[in-house]
Every structure is written in structure tokens, then in C-alpha cells.
Amino acid sequence: MKNDNRIIKNTIKQFKEKLCRDFSQKANITSITRKLAVFIDTILIQLFIKNKLHFGDNFCLLALGSYGRRELQLHSDIDLLILHTEKVSNIQLQRAQKFIQDCWDVGLEVSHQITTVSSCANLASQDLSVISTIMDMFLLCGHGALMEELIYQTHTLHMWPSHQYFFAKLQEQQSRYAKYGETAYNLEPNIKNGPGGLRDLQILLSISKRHFKIKKLAEGIGYGFITDKEYEELKYCQNFLWRVRFALHMLAGKPEERLSFDYQVKLAQFFGYQDQSHILAIEQFMKDYFKVIKRNRELNEMLLQWFNETIVYHQKQKIIRLDDEFQLSNRFIEVRNNRVFKQNPQSILKLFYWLVKRPDIEGVRASTIRLIRESLFLMGKRFRESKETANIFVNIFRTGNDPYDALQRMNRYGVLAHYLDCFATVTGQMQYDLFHAYTVDQHTLFVIRNISRFKKNEYAKQFPLCAKIITALEKPEILYLGALFHDIAKGRGGDHSELGAIEAQQFTQRHYMEAEDSKLIVWLVRYHLLMSQTAQRKDIYDPKTIEQFCQLLPHAKYLDYLYLLTVADICGTNPTLWNAWKDSLLKELYHAAKTRLHKQQELLDEAALISIRKQYAMDILISDGISSRVIQDLWSQFKGKYFLHESPEVIARHTKAILNSKQFPVVIIMPHHSQGGTEVFIYMPHKDERFTITTSVLSNHHVTIQEAAIITCDNQFDLDTYIILDENNQAFLNEQRARDIQKSLCDHLANTGRLPAVSRRRLSRALTHFNVKTQINFIDDNTNHQTQLFLVTNDRPGLLATISRVFLTLNIHLHNAKIATAGERVEDMFYISNQTGYSLNHEEKTILKEKLILEISKSKY
């Protein structure tokens, strides 16, 4: 018996290998999935007969789900139902269990249920997934009357009537969408369960079967809910996704459903995509994938809406006239006749204007969605150059209401891509990195959604400054249009901000916008990265940084628009990017720039600023009973840049801690509320290796440094401040963890022995698939006798500790550091000097660059 199973197992292996060869040679995927199902039939029937279950009328073997539909993928589960009569003996049931064991022994991944008709029907009446799989039953072997009885008992007359089944499947899809963040355009999409995936096709067939009692979706053409063209589109989407899924199973050697980064690369190679000068093979493949997903989701939406109208509202219509062209039918907008778009193509955009103007409209009727899709050819050059068209499009953003849902529909139905050629080029365009979580078109729409959220009460607590600014914004449509165009030139090569500004300029001219409005939109697109780059890469506590930033703002109002766009952009790029740290940096930059712009004051010199901050801090300390003489004695040892970098409240806190301390090093760990992180403050006798020790200890405690200010005082004491975040990029509040880090820092900083070893940690799975070439650039700051070192490289555990050891080895002194991580990419700025306290010369830069590249390349754990 064991030998028989071994032979069968080998036969299955050989057959699947042949299918893989056929598939690699471009064999038809529908034929392959059917061949696999039929082949598995023969194996199961053979095992069923071997276990003597085919005799008499006691048992029935049924294929369910995709196997029942004859659509078996390479490593899909094989869903089986074994029905038996009430009178079967224990011996016969044991044979059924033995049959299942044999299936497992020959390597078949079988999911099964052994039950009676009545028990199965009872379960189906309570479980949506059971009734759905039963509707795909296929008789393999045994007494067919049992299957017929199950069909009868699970008929809509007895359970799950059409409308109830429809609502349940709709809710199931909504829950599935929510699980995947309402978008199919994720970095690693799920081909089976993600929005626009294969489940979106299966739900259409399931509802059709339940309501119309059809067996195949093609039969729906006769019922009028799908056209020949739409069926061909669905068939194309299905075959594309089947091919990708079969290849994914083949490459993974298991039932993998997620297109992870490593498989994306392999799939692109398998399907023959090749790198081009400005777009990678993987990006081309994923762009095609996302276009199919988009089309699939669009058809899913339209047909589900048709089912809703047919199954739920087939006799209940409440009509409300909107104008001569549109009306509401049960709160869904529709054309008043099928000639509307042909007679006036501008009405295509007018429909979406109504969706924004009337937030109570729940959606678009299926017949009108179909008419939009069939009328896209009307949106030609003449349509796009029409002044009426231009006015309608811009007015979509001028209603004062949220345009996000309407724009999402415009994107799904293909209207945006037909109206804006430049938008068509970024539709489905992914960026192969960990920083950008969505395709460019979906990211753009998420940015617009975020802008709208700033107006809503439920988001006011999360974004209080944004809520305050946007309510006073003179023309919100400018912000929306800036958002629409900010990434419009991605994927072309070159500076997408500059290229996008050209597109924005052409758009504003074609849409007859006022000169001032046009200037602001174009400026927003050109400088949409200015605020985030300034906040994350430069010293925003330096008055010169604020002055340079403000010089790029043509008018004070530009700051409000830029701040809102920056926050919306970061939040719409990746859900993990926004945190209290970035929030605090941008707010501080905003407020500093606002003060500078509105007061129209001359730039205060550093001495004046230091004096002001000292006085405020002094007032705080004196109110706590500390002598001004003691304070001044201590402060006389501090460098001026310390007072520039810290607020009066923080200066007072540090001063108090030092004066109250009886031993060194002084190490304080506490929340830094204004900066959204946790502050590590260190005061101790000078020690060259203290930056290396600190970065190593913090790395071992799995925290990340966001900013570092390193100062050696005139009394040869070190005055260092770090802002750190936990593994989730948040300030940590765990007091025990803070005490552990504090103790570890005190022990190692006081120790004159060896440097602490850095614990070796594996790179995350995602990080291993990206290779950012290490880039190092130097800029001399002659005013401060420092050199700015800008470093770009792959993120990895312990990176900063590695860099600090290079600095220590080469006697490089660090004064300040700004740490920015964007997905797999690290962009760090270090302000350094040589051991004599001056900017690095050419030779020192060369040696440092070579050493950093070498050590970083060795630190890939």
C-alpha cells in the first residue's frame, strides 16, 4: 500500500513538473488549470475506489470551490466534501478517514468535510463560506443523488435568498477591503484576497449563481447584466491574474498569494520584462499588474451596483431630478437618457461635479458607469481644450466639499487618465522601494484625501495645526491642484519636481486660472519637498536656516499651503512615516518661519537670540530657588550653539539636573514633548569615544537616534543631547526601559575599558531585497569651520554605531547630526570637523569617504 502511494505521489510530482514546463512555454492558463483539476480527479477517484467507498449508495465525493469550478492552481488547496447517508457504519466512516489519509500521504493538500446532507445543509444555512463553496460543487465519484439532495436543501427557497446572500457577500468584500487598507496598490499586494484580486471575480460569479442559477459568468450576457466586451475584459483580467498566480506558486514551491519583493523581481524576469533607462523591469511588470487590478475592481464595482439595483431595488425607485441631464435614483446618480454624453461630452465631468457638490449621493448607477466607460472616446483633444470642460474640472475642487471619492471614481473609471495625459503615465506606476507604499496615482489621491480630512472634526485632534490653517485658507482648490500635480512627473527620469512644475504651468494656462493662483500652484509642485527636506536635514534651530527657507517663499501665505501639502504628502506616502517626531519638526519650522515672515524683522544675530533664551531660562530657574550666580558660572562654560539649539524650558531642565548631580556622567532620559521623541541628555568630563559608546548602547537597546547635538564645553565637559524613538518610531514611555538604558549608558560612559560590542541583528526580510548604493558628499561650512557630510545608504541595524567608530578611528569630531530614514534608504547629515577643530581638507575627506564605504559594506548583517 505504501509503495502504491509513493508511486502516486511521484506521478503527481511528474505531472505538475510537466504542467510547469508547458506553462513556461506559454501554454494557455485556462487549459492548464483545467488539466490539473482533471488529473487530480483521476487520483482521487482511484483512492476513493481503493478504499471501497464507491460501492452502493452510501457515499458521494464532491469537489468544491475553485477545484469544483475546474480552476485548480499549482499549489491550491483541494476542497473536498464527502457526503454519506445516515445509515453508514463506523467501519465505512473509518474508510472515509483512510481515504483522506491516503490523500495526504500522496502529497495532496486536502481540506475536507465528511458529513450527512442534512448536517451540511444546516451548516450552510449559518455559514456564508460553506454555502458559497457548495454552489461550486462538482461530482467526482459515488452516489449522485446525495449531491442532488444537497442542492435541493440549499436552494434559495430554503436558505440564503438572493438579497440576503448579496448583502452578506457585499459585507464580506468590504471587510476584506478594510483588511488591505482599502487599496490594491500596496507594495506587496495579495493576488487572491486584495482589492481587485481574484476574489473580486469570484464574488460576481457567486452572486450570479445564487440569483440567476447560472453556472458560468458568460451566461450573464443573456441576462443583460454584462456585455460581451465586459465579459472579455473580465476574462482578460482573470487570465492575467491566473498566470501570475500560477507562476508565483511555481517559483515559491508553495501556495504563496502575496507578491513579495523577491517574487516580484523573479516574476518580472519570468515574464520577460527588461530594465529600461528610466524604469526597472519590476516596475513595468507591477504597472501592468496594477492596471489589471484597477480594471478588475472597476468592473466589480459596476456589476455589484447592477446586482444591487436588480436584486434589492428592482421594484423600489425614488427619483429626484438634479438638472436636465442627471437625476437621483435611490440616492444613486444616473443620466436621464443614454444620449447625454454623446450630446454633451462635458457632462462626463459634470457628473463628478455633482458627486462632490452633493455629498448625500451614495454612488453612480451601474448603467451610467457603463455609459461613462463607453463614452471615454469622446474625451479627445477638442474636449480637453474646451473652456467649459476646464471650468467644470476646476469647479470640482471649488465646491468646499471633499473631492476624494469623486476623484477615486474618476480614476477607477478611466476619466482622469483620459482627461490628463500626464496622469495616465503615473497610473499604476509603482516605485520599487520601501518608502513609497502605494502607486503614484493612488498616493496622489490619498494626499487629496488627507487634505480633506484636515477639515473634518474627527481629525482635528490628530492634526490641530492643519485644522486651524485650512479653515482660514483663501483658496483650497489651489492646494488640491498642487497635490494633484506634485508627483505627476514621477517615473520619467530627471527631477520630478521641476518636470511636474512644467506640467502644472501648462495645466493652469489651459484652465484659464488667474496669474497669482497659477504661480502658487506651480511653486507648490516645484517646492513640495522643501519643507520636509529642511526640517529633516538641516538645523532648524539655526536662524540662518530659517532665513534661507523664508527666502524661497514669495509670500507669507505660501507657507500655509506648503505646510498642509507637506503633512498630507508624508501621511499619504506610507502609513508608518508620520509620527510625533516629524510632526514636531514641521511645526517648529512652520512657527519659526511664520514669525520671521509676519514680523518682517531683520534677522537677529546669534548673540541676541542667545541672550533672549538665557533670560527666559534664568527666570524659570530663579523661580525654583536657584542662585543666578551659580547658573551664570555654569553657563559661562557652555558654547553659544547650545543655547541656539535648545528651548528655554529644556535649558532650565538640563541646568537643574547638572547642578543637582553629585557624580558624573549625568544621564537623563525623559520625554521631549515639543519634539515628539524621547530625550537623552549626557553631561560628563570630555571623552573622545562618548559618541561611539552612546550609539552602540542605544543600538543594543533597539532604539533609533533621530538627532544628535554634540558639544564640548570650555571646561572640557561634554554636553550632548539625543532625540530617540523606539522600534515603532514613537517616543517610548516605559519607565523601566528608560532606567535600563540610563544605567547601561552610565556604566559604559564611566568605564575606561573597551567599547561596548554592538549586537548583531538580521536585516528585516523587506530590507534584504533593496540595495542603495552608498553615496557620500561633503559641503564646507567656512563660517562655523565645519564640514557637512551627507550620507545616503541602506538602512540596517547598528548603522550609526558603525559610522561613529569610523569617526573615532580617524579623529573626526561630530558636532551635530540629522538622521532621516525613508524606507530602506537612510539619508543622514553630519556636521563634523577634524581633530584641530577645522573643516576637513581634501585628503581627510577622501580617507573618511573610503573608510565609511568600506565599513558600511562590511556591516550588512
From Swiss-Prot:
Residues 440-562 form the HD domain. It catalyses: [protein-PII]-L-tyrosine + UTP = [protein-PII]-uridylyl-L-tyrosine + diphosphate; [protein-PII]-uridylyl-L-tyrosine + H2O = [protein-PII]-L-tyrosine + UMP + H(+). Keywords: Hydrolase, Magnesium, Multifunctional enzyme, Nucleotidyltransferase, Repeat, Transferase. The keyword ATP-binding does not apply. GO terms for molecular function: [protein-PII] uridylyltransferase activity; phosphoric diester hydrolase activity. InterPro entries: ACT-like_dom_sf, ACT_dom, GlnD_Uridyltrans_N, HD/PDEase_dom, HD_domain, NT_sf, PII_UdlTrfase/GS_AdlTrfase, UTase/UR. Modifies, by uridylylation and deuridylylation, the PII regulatory proteins (GlnB and homologs), in response to the nitrogen status of the cell that GlnD senses through the glutamine level. Under low glutamine levels, catalyzes the conversion of the PII proteins and UTP to PII-UMP and PPi, while under higher glutamine levels, GlnD hydrolyzes PII-UMP to PII and UMP (deuridylylation). Thus, controls uridylylation state and activity of the PII proteins, and plays an important role in the regulation of nitrogen assimilation and metabolism. Belongs to the GlnD family. NCBIfam families: UTase_glnD. Has four distinct domains: an N-terminal nucleotidyltransferase (NT) domain responsible for UTase activity, a central HD domain that encodes UR activity, and two C-terminal ACT domains that seem to have a role in glutamine sensing. This is Bifunctional uridylyltransferase/uridylyl-removing enzyme.
